[in-house]
């Protein structure tokens, strides 16, 4: 496994697909990384030379926020929303959907919590 951005990316996959295993890198950013480093998108990670891997690492380090830094940034943004007491922050605090989804019948995953016990059928 090649180690890029603190993540072991799979060797048997194409470079564009393997880069998406890194948190914060989607398909469009993976394409941009390949173009910026001058690497063919369809080549497998196992076929990359060590200097190609170093190019990719340097490109990501220079211009992308990924993995732990990105997770920390997202958590700080959510904490900021909760601290200022805006509507989105209140929804986060109550563990309800934030983006306007209905909650009367849905949102079971986000709400979590207790389930009502179903009474056993009478025979």
Curated annotation (Swiss-Prot):
Please provide the record's keywords in A-Z order.
Ribonucleoprotein, Ribosomal protein, RNA-binding, rRNA-binding, tRNA-binding
Where is this chain compositionally biased, Basic residues type?
99-113
Q: Indicate yes or no for the key word Nucleotide-binding.
A: no
The record's GO molecular-function terms, alphabetically, read:
rRNA binding; structural constituent of ribosome; tRNA binding
Query: For the region Disordered, what residue ranges are annotated?
Result: 99-123
Mind listing the GO biological process terms from this record?
Answer: translation
According to the record, the signal peptide region is none
Per the record, its GO cellular-component terms are: cytosol; small ribosomal subunit
* Function per UniProt: Located at the top of the head of the 30S subunit, it contacts several helices of the 16S rRNA. In the 70S ribosome it contacts the 23S rRNA (bridge B1a) and protein L5 of the 50S subunit (bridge B1b), connecting the 2 subunits; these bridges are implicated in subunit movement. Contacts the tRNAs in the A and P-sites.
Q: How does it assemble?
A: Part of the 30S ribosomal subunit. Forms a loose heterodimer with protein S19. Forms two bridges to the 50S subunit in the 70S ribosome.
- Give the matching PANTHER family: 30S RIBOSOMAL PROTEIN S13/40S RIBOSOMAL PROTEIN S18 (PTHR10871), SMALL RIBOSOMAL SUBUNIT PROTEIN US13M (PTHR10871:SF1)
Which family does the UniProt entry place this protein in? Belongs to the universal ribosomal protein uS13 family.
**What is this protein identified as?**
Small ribosomal subunit protein uS13
Report the source organism.
Anaplasma phagocytophilum (strain HZ)
